[in-house]
Amino acid sequence: MTNNDKIVAIVTSIAVICISLTVIFCDTLVLAVGVPTLVLLWLVFLGWINNKKLDKGEMRRAITGSIVIAFFIILIAISKNPDIYSNNKEIFSLFFGMVTTIIGYYFGYRSGKESKNSSGNE
C-alpha cells in the first residue's frame, strides 16, 4: 500500500465518520448543507491527491457529486415530509431542473471527451 493509498483511506474514513455524525445528530438544514459540502471537499481531495493538481475535470466531478448528494437529501426529506414540497414547489422545480442540466452536461462532456480520445487513438 502506497502513501497515497493510506492517505486516501484515512481521509475517506474521516469523511464517512463526519457524514455519519452529521446525519445522526444534526437537523435537516445542517444535513442539507453539511453533507454536500463534505462530499465536495472529499472529492476535491481525491482529485488533488491523484496528481497534486486540480484540473477542470476534477472540479466538475466534485461539484456534480455534491449537487447530486444534495438532490438525494432533498428527495429523502420530501419523502419523509411531503408538506416541504407543497410549500416550496417553485424552488424544488428549479433545483430539479438545475440538477438535470448539470448531470446532462457532465455526462455529455465525458462522452464527448471519450469519443474524441478514442478517435484520436485510431
Swiss-Prot record:
Say if the entry is tagged with keyword Transmembrane helix.
Answer: yes
User: Which InterPro entries does the UniProt record give?
Assistant: Cytb/b6-like_sf (IPR027387)
Q: Give the UniProt entry's GO cellular component terms.
A: plasma membrane
Major subcellular location class: membrane
Q: Where in the cell is it found?
A: Cell membrane
How does the UniProt record describe the way this protein sits in the membrane?
A: Multi-pass membrane protein
User: What transmembrane ranges does the database entry give?
Assistant: 7-27, 29-49, 62-82, 89-109
Keyword field: Cell membrane, Membrane, Transmembrane, Transmembrane helix
Checking Gene3D superfamilies in the record gives: Cytochrome Bc1 Complex, Chain C
Q: Has keyword Ribosomal protein?
A: no
The name under which this protein is listed is: Uncharacterized protein MJ0321
Q: Which organism is it from?
A: Methanocaldococcus jannaschii (strain ATCC 43067 / DSM 2661 / JAL-1 / JCM 10045 / NBRC 100440)
